């Protein structure tokens, strides 16, 4: 039985006072962090994971591999609170969990450094590091991951301080629960095992303890039973529900992600080590990196076991993330950032101690001996570190005006014909799915985002089964068409704003060319000419996009490369309201054999963003080679405007007439020019 020593009354009061001060500092950290996170929070559903996770949480569904059951069960009740829309609720809870994680990390850093001021500064520095801050701006699993990771480290430290087995048992259960949120938790297990062994030795690992820990771990990780249970009701978004043991295994092991592991040879991890260094500088700045290194060295000398524990977490994180090739790999650096901020805490504590000793030697006639005067000036200067983090990263992570994913989804929903098939990658499918499964908009649309869509044999199978021909209309999202070479070679793709309309059976090429003289109204460089612009036929209904037709022709200097037409909407003061691009693809039929003298018609649709006020606006077009940042010169720019933009039309936006989730949608009432 564990021995329990009752503290004296005086000691108990001191403990209460310390705990009360910690509670106040934790509250301040939550408040400061949350205010910063709400300032930059995205106002709506985002691309990819964000929309998918919101949709799944609202319906108690299954996310992409491995499913994230812990996150779903926590977020579901909050997604049902009738405040704002569903996206706001889940985004807010993500930000709130981020703020709670910062408070938990303060307790970790205060314990490691032995200094509250140092713990406060280190936690606030982590709070406004770019990667973590960015994860608080929209629905994501990583703020909860940091919460659980910080709690796990606190339990390790509590076990060390008390020696009570209950912390080990509770930690075993929590690790299982944490794995139900993200697999990054597994990287902590070797460090925890080392620390327990270093503290207690081999004799601590008795059969009884191991059995209890294993049972509690199994209880925690049994949260994955959520996946097959919920799959029985097939909840939205319907992309990941496992209905068999094979599908369950595939969901847990993420075969698509495994293909990106250890796939680049032995040189890439070495190159990634340099990338880690650059990211650390970007996250914490030179001052934060210097303090982190200084603190890491001090911790190694003072507490070797704890230092190795944190180092093992960092090393396993670096080794794992350096061998994983995904576009958002930077979020996998968060365990390293947690460890680095611990070094910052130790470094800040050491600086404060040195300054305090120096100030103690100053005569009391010059400086008051109170702690405020001994440590206050140095603490205020070191507080510049999180302040610089905030100011440097604010613009990088600010998503408060980011409506791009919602505008895209509403544009697709408004232009797609009834019963259409939408083929896209997960990043574009998810926001359309939010409209369908949460707002109930366009429930007739069929969306397909399976991995086999990228495989040529998969497309051939669909074609053999007349899969594509069975739908009244098919749309492809632009990014995906760059990868689907076979589709571009076999089908006819017509650009329509943010998507391509797919015609499985190509019409004759001569039928696709406009029978008008190829005399350009405006030239973009010596490569592409715009012959004319026409308003598309048909009335514009409130809330729907307005359409126009552009007629393009190649010029003498045309080099056979793909070009992008970029459309920009500006107000009368020249402020940009909206922008999107469209591919004039040379390898898209019928432009694959485009020749001088031929004119091709392109239909384009624009969906106005909600914040557009009634008034007059100018619509410009500019052209650039695909993949280039510089645009081609325009030979007929508007007076007083830059030399790359051609004025397509001036449009009159009237009073809003249709309702969206956030309010009324602006409507184009007239084309003033041309």
At which residue positions do the language-model features occur?
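Hydrophobic, aromatic-rich transmembrane alpha-helices
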Residues: 282-304, 357
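Transmembrane alpha-helical segments
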Residues: 375-401
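C-terminal luminal/periplasmic domains and tails of membrane-associated envelope-modifying transferases
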Residues: 16, 410-433, 439-674
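Hydrophobic/aromatic-rich transmembrane helices and adjacent perimembrane loops
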Residues: 308-311, 319-359
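Transmembrane-helix signature of polytopic, membrane-embedded enzymes
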Residues: 23-26, 105-128, 147, 166, ...
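Membrane-interface transmembrane helices that cradle and orient dolichyl/undecaprenyl
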Residues: 110-116, 136, 152-168, 175-177, ...
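Perimembrane helix-loop-helix junctions
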Residues: 160-161, 187-218, 361, 385
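Transmembrane-helix motifs of polytopic, lipid-linked glycan transferases
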Residues: 27, 92-113, 151-155, 294, ...
């Amino acid at each position: 039985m564990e021995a329990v020593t009752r503290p004296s009354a005086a000691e108990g009061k001191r403990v209460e006072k310390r705990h009360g001060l910690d509670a106040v500092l934790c509250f301040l950290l939550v408040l400061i962090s949350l205010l910063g996170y709400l300032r930059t929070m995205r106002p709506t559903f985002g691309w990819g994971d964000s929309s998918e996770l919101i949709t799944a949480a609202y319906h108690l569904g299954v996310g992409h591999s491995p499913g994230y059951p812990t996150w779903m069960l926590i977020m579901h009740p909050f997604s049902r609170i009738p405040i704002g829309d569903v996206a706001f609720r889940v985004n807010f809870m993500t930000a709130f969990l981020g703020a709670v994680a910062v408070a938990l990390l303060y307790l970790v850093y205060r314990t490691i450094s032995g200094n509250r001021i140092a713990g406060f500064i280190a936690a606030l520095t982590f709070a406004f590091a770019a990667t973590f801050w960015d994860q608080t701006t929209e629905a994501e699993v990583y703020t909860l991951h940091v919460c659980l990771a910080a709690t796990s480290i606190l339990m390790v430290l509590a076990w060390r301080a008390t020696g009570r087995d209950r912390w080990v048992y509770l930690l075993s259960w929590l690790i299982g629960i944490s794995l139900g949120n993200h697999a990054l938790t597994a990287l902590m297990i070797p460090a925890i095992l080392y620390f327990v062994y270093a503290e207690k030795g081999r004799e601590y690992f008795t059969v009884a303890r191991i059995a209890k820990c294993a049972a509690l771990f199994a209880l925690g990780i049994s949260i994955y039973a959520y996946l097959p249970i919920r799959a029985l009701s097939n909840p939205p978004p319907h992309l990941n529900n496992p209905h068999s043991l094979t599908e369950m295994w595939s969901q847990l092991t993420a075969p698509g992600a495994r293909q990106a592991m250890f796939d680049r040879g032995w040189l890439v991890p070495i190159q990634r080590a340099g990338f880690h260094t650059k990211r650390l500088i970007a996250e914490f700045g030179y001052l934060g990196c210097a303090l982190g290194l200084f603190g890491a060295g001090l911790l190694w000398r003072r507490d070797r076991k704890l230092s190795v524990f944190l180092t093992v977490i960092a090393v396993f994180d670096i080794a794992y993330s350096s061998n994983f090739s995904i576009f958002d790999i930077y979020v996998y650096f968060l365990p390293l950032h947690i460890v680095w901020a611990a070094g910052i805490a130790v470094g800040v504590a050491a600086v404060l101690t040195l300054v305090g000793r120096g100030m103690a030697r100053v005569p009391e006639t010059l400086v008051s001996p109170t702690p405020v005067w001994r440590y206050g000036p140095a603490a205020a200067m070191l507080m510049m570190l999180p302040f610089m983090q905030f100011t440097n990263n604010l613009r990088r992570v600010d998503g408060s005006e980011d409506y791009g994913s919602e505008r895209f989804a509403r544009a697709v929903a408004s232009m797609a014909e009834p019963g259409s098939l939408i083929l896209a990658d997960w990043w574009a499918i998810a926001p359309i799915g939010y409209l369908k499964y949460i707002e109930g908009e366009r429930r007739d649309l069929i969306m397909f985002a399976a991995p086999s869509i990228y495989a040529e044999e998969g497309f051939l199978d669909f074609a053999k089964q007349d899969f594509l021909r069975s739908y009244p209309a098919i749309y492809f999202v632009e990014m995906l068409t760059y990868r689907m070479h076979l589709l571009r070679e076999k089908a006819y793709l017509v650009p329509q704003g943010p998507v391509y309309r797919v015609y499985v059976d190509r019409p004759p090429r001569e039928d696709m060319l406009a029978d008008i003289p190829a005399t350009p109204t405006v030239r973009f460089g010596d490569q592409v000419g715009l012959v004319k612009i026409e308003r598309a036929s048909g009335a514009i209904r409130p809330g729907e996009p307005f359409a126009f037709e552009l007629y393009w022709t190649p010029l003498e200097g045309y080099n056979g490369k793909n070009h992008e037409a970029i459309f920009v909407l500006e107000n009368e003061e020249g402020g940009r309201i909206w922008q999107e691009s469209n591919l004039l693809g040379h390898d898209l039929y019928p432009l694959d054999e485009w020749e001088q003298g031929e004119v091709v018609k392109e239909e384009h649709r624009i969906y106005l963003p909600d914040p557009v006020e009634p008034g007059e606006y100018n619509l410009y077009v500019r052209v650039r080679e695909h993949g280039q940042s510089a645009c081609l010169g325009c030979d007929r720019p508007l007076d007083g405007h830059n030399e790359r933009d051609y004025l397509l039309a001036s449009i009159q936006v009237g009073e809003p007439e249709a309702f969206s989730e956030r309010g009324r949608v602006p409507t184009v009432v007239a084309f003033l020019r041309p």
